[in-house]
Amino acid sequence: MDNNKLEHLEQEDFIGFWKRVLATILDLLVILIPAVIVYMLFNSLAVSLHSEIPIILEYIFFIVFDIFMIVRFGGSPGKLILKMKIINDQGKYPTLKEALVRNIFRIISTIFSMIVGVSLYDLTAISTNLALWAPLANDLSKILAPIMLVDYLFVAFTPRKRALHDIMAGTYVVDKSAI
């Protein structure tokens, strides 16, 4: 799809707030069981190896999974189930750079969560040092939460129903049948 076709999409072809919320709920349901298995595996591995590396890899895995799904398939599992696609200005799946920009708030939030999560373990100097940063990461998470809320609320009030992260990345969430 070229940029000209993007201009001809109707307002109803762009996915609104509540349908995106439903996609997020589906994501949680679809990913929950595998996520719990990965969590249990990586955390038990961390304890048995006396290393935080498996826990850090767990956080990295979920970031990479999100980015991969957007670049390769044009959406998260929930979006794909609901026949939505994430596209860029050229009407194609987002590039790696666009997917990274699109997920910047989630990546930052995950880093803060990782710092707090790893600091709960007392395995090596890594967790001891991260424990020093945990209060700051926790406070920054509290600041990031309302920013992420505003980010998602943009969908309800912007032309083409774009979240702040969509605007930053140059992406759109559209009905699959429209492209």
Spell out what each predicted region is:
Residues M1-I179:
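Membrane-interfacial and juxtamembrane segments of integral membrane proteins
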